[in-house]
């Protein structure tokens, strides 16, 4: 006798009344298609509470320990409205810091969904992650700085294309600057200020665009990146047309697009400065244990001492690169790169009569005196002079 074919309330009353008289309780339960446990429950409820209590009881608990108060819900909604593009985990950390304890991450998600404060994202197809030429990843502050220009947009002040510089390990945003242009001199002045304030990094990660690189030059060196090499900074570059090689930096640019570019403001640099302060001092990051970048970043121990007049190649011959990109060796003019104009390079003789050509720690290639030619190194990999000696 399936339960669903008859009125549930009448069926329970009928069963309970018959259960008071039957001698074979289990057979009666089989007749009604229920377990003895359910049968005893309905019989006992009739005896203890009367026939009217045989109706279905709510399965909802009388108390819900995890239920949020109205005040907690309002706090969560206020946080989400203030930080419209932050996820539940970041908002939970901000809440905990402000109030000592915080509801669960799932509670944050539930409140935001019910308040209509969650935008559904289109699922992206998984992409094949690629390795860059030098796959070094930072393990301490200032081990690697990542840099790029945020894609431009137009505002009331004209074209805006901010330069962004970030410490890769701590996520600390060192600079987001709306420069007048992207010329080498302008960007170099900006980096001189950064080096003076934060010291020098061990390496700088960039894409292959101007002014960070020059696709047609020796090892992709531009005047700007040659200056970095002269300061003892290694160059890390992503593959052409592979922005995922600097993925963390690109994600930060998307945040700028949503939270600055897409909002009204009177002064672009003031708006960028406010966003930078929030990013560093208010926004927790999962990769650093939900801490703020300002809590884990510290300036570099390598202090900025200005640009050297010339580079020291102890024990090696040295030649200065002319404005045309040539060096003079044994009365022969040999072309290297105009990006090295004004710098001196080191020459180390080899047993076969050729010479290794170094720029700071970077092996550029081989000079062949007999043919007055130069063969550049195919891979841009820094090599210590002492290892080559």
Predicted ranges, named:
Residues 1-14, 62-70:
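Short, Lys/Arg-enriched anionic-surface-contact patches
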Residues 6-23, 73-82:
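Short, amphipathic alpha-helical "recognition" segments used to contact nucleic acids or chromatin
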Residues 15, 28-29, 39-42, 50, ...:
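Mobile genetic element proteins and their domesticated derivatives, centered on retroelements
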Residues 51-144, 222, 292-302:
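Basic, flexible linker segments flanking DNA-binding modules
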Residues 67, 71, 101-102, 106, ...:
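Mobile-element integrase/transposase regions
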Residues 195-218, 239-241, 246, 292-293:
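Acidic/histidine-rich, metal-coordinating catalytic segments
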Residues 224-305, 346, 350-351:
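Charged alpha-helix within mobile-element recombinases
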Residues 276, 280-389:
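C-terminal, beta-rich DNA-binding module of retroviral/retroelements integrases
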